[in-house]
């Protein structure tokens, strides 16, 4: 029979549990005299306690797993906040930050675009960070590169609006036309699209998506809440209100 594979955290918890099981046994007056207990007897007592109380170790392991999951999520959210170079909508200095993992060929991203614009028009204290996450096509990558490049030139919002309201699949011609209409210097744009800095921004987003277990678009993150898929404007407003209520 294949033996179960224990992780480092499990082994650590077993050692800790063994210690506390020992303490519980030794608090019994019958076993209080350490000198009268040899190692073999002690091992037998600990084993018997564990066998008689399996739910204790099960609950302890569950609590350990929950703590580890929470720690990993907090680390992933901290990494998400590294947003230098990411395109931004709304108020760049807004006190509430919302992140959207987005792809310009994503129909659901285009569906949620309108509600997002409405919320940003109503609320001037939101910094809305676009995490360029090109996963659907090669043109998605080109569009993401151009988005980051238009952010450098300060014309990203209009570029973003043009592509998000484009009903069909995008092409390089569509991308360059959107950038040109937004007022971008196309020669500089193409240089920035192919820069190491732009590649680093996209790679950072891919790493962040993996850490947060976001595999599709759109994916919104508000505080510690991760919302996969498109949502309505009312749902977005509710989540924003809940996040602000948490902060007091």
Language model regions located:
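Soluble non-cytosolic domains of exported or imported proteins
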Residues: 36-40, 51, 107-110, 137-141, ...
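C-terminal cap of thioredoxin/glutaredoxin-like
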Residues: 9, 17, 33-39, 43, ...
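Structural alpha/beta surface segment adjacent to cysteine/selenocysteine redox centers
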Residues: 99, 104, 110-180, 184-185, ...
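Short coil/turn segments at secondary-structure boundaries
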Residues: 61, 91-92, 222
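Short amphipathic alpha-helical/adjacent loop interface patches that line ligand
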Residues: 54, 113, 206
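A short structural micro-motif
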Residues: 66-67, 166-169, 181, 196-199
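N-terminal targeting signals for export/organelle localization
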Residues: 2-6, 16, 20, 27-78
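A short beta-strand-turn-helix
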Residues: 79-96
């Amino acid at each position: 029979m294949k033996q179960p594979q224990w992780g480092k955290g499990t082994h650590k918890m077993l050692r800790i549990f063994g210690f506390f099981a020992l303490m519980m046994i030794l608090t019994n007056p019958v076993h209080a005299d350490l000198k009268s207990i040899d190692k073999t007897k002690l091992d037998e007592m600990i084993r018997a306690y564990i066998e008689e109380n399996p739910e204790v170790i099960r609950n302890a392991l569950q609590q350990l797993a929950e703590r580890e999951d929470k720690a990993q999520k907090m680390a992933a959210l901290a990494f998400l906040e590294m947003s230098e170079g990411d395109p931004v909508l709304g108020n760049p200095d807004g006190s509430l930050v919302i992140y959207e993992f987005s792809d310009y060929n994503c129909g659901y991203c285009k569906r949620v675009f309108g509600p997002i614009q409405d919320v940003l028009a109503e609320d001037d204290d939101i910094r809305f960070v676009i995490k360029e996450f090109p996963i659907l096509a090669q043109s998605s990558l080109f569009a993401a590169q151009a988005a980051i490049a238009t952010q450098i030139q300060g014309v990203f919002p209009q570029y973003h609006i043009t592509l998000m309201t484009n009903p069909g699949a995008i092409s390089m011609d569509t991308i360059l036309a959107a950038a040109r209409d937004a007022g971008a210097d196309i020669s500089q744009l193409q240089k920035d699209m192919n820069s190491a800095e732009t590649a680093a921004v996209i790679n950072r987003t891919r790493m962040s998506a993996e850490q947060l277990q976001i595999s599709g678009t759109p994916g919104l993150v508000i505080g510690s809440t991760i919302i996969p898929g498109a949502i309505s404007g009312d749902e977005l407003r509710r989540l924003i209100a809940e996040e602000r209520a948490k902060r007091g």
